[in-house]
């Protein structure tokens, strides 16, 4: 009996161990990659693709079950793009906005719900890909490239006229804004996800039974909000690049 109790407590404490900065490195062409990030990212992507395949396997005129849920999700993501980019030009950008939202949402929830610490790695530990700054910076840079592409594809070289509007005095500030946008996107997402995981780990370490559950529930809500914020801001930046300045 005592051994069973000790085993349960020991398992709970092992789940709450805090390890920051340790990584499983894969060396590819002289580059060191964070292996645990790729593993969890691939699992999240596979889960999203699998869910999409199951949901579109037997499409019906009157949607039911998972098809009905998927159509609701699609309409929700479509509304994000439409509201931020505009009725006329939002459609080509729905796939990107939806992909960003679903990946961040899936990655955040995977990190919050799945007890990755039970899976032992030679180094580091599995966790939400979004608690790695490299992932959030990459996502933010994708958004930056997207709104540059949107502006240039519509306006050509004339897109750069926005840097001197409404007055050339604002040129340095407008240039600086292009650097602060990806910085704010990446650090906001990274900081919130990492802070949530650390708070849950600390609570689980101090009081491993039941007490962390409310914090985990709040973390799931915050994870969903972060996915919404990132995708909404991405759509807003693209919409800003597409709008006509007079």
Swiss-Prot record:
CDD domains: ATP-synt_Fo_a_6 (cd00310)
Taxonomic superkingdom: Eukaryota
TM spans (from-to): 35-55, 94-114, 133-153, 202-222
A molecular-function term among this protein's GO annotations: proton-transporting ATP synthase activity, rotational mechanism
One Pfam match: ATP-synt_A
GO cellular component terms listed in the entry, alphabetical order: chloroplast thylakoid membrane; plasma membrane; proton-transporting ATP synthase complex
Listed InterPro entries: ATP_syn_F0_a_bact/chloroplast (IPR045082), ATP_synth_F0_asu (IPR000568), ATP_synth_F0_asu_AS (IPR023011), F0_ATP_A_sf (IPR035908)
Membrane topology, as annotated: Multi-pass membrane protein
Localization in the cell: Plastid, Chloroplast thylakoid membrane
The protein's assembly and partners: F-type ATPases have 2 components, CF(1) - the catalytic core - and CF(0) - the membrane proton channel. CF(1) has five subunits: alpha(3), beta(3), gamma(1), delta(1), epsilon(1). CF(0) has four main subunits: a, b, b' and c.
Role: Key component of the proton channel; it plays a direct role in the translocation of protons across the membrane.
Family (UniProt): Belongs to the ATPase A chain family.
Protein name in UniProt: ATP synthase subunit a, chloroplastic
Organism, as annotated: Rhodomonas salina
């Amino acid at each position: 009996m005592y051994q069973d109790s000790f085993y349960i407590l020991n398992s709970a404490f092992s789940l709450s161990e805090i390890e920051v900065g340790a990584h499983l490195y894969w060396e590819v062409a002289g580059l060191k990659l964070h292996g645990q990030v790729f593993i969890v990212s691939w699992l999240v992507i596979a889960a999203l693709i699998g869910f999409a395949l199951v949901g579109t396997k037997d499409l019906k005129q009157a949607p039911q079950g998972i098809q009905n849920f998927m159509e609701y999700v699609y309409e929700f993501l479509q509304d994000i793009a439409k509201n931020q980019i505009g009725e006329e030009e939002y459609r080509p950008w729905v796939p990107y906005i939806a992909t960003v939202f679903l990946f961040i949402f899936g990655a955040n929830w995977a990190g919050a719900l799945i007890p990755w610490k039970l899976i032992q790695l030679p180094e580091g530990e599995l966790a939400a890909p979004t608690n790695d700054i490299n992932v959030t910076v990459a996502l933010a840079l994708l958004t930056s490239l997207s709104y540059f592409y949107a502006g240039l594809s519509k306006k050509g070289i004339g897109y750069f006229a926005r840097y001197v509007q409404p007055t050339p005095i604002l040129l340095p500030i407008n240039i600086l804004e292009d650097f602060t946008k990806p910085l704010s996107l990446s650090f906001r997402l990274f900081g919130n996800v990492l802070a949530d995981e650390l708070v849950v780990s600390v609570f689980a370490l101090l009081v491993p039974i039941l007490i962390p559950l409310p914090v985990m529930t709040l973390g799931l809500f915050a994870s969903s909000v972060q996915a919404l914020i990132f995708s909404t801001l991405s759509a807003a930046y693209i919409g800003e690049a597409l709008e006509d300045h007079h």
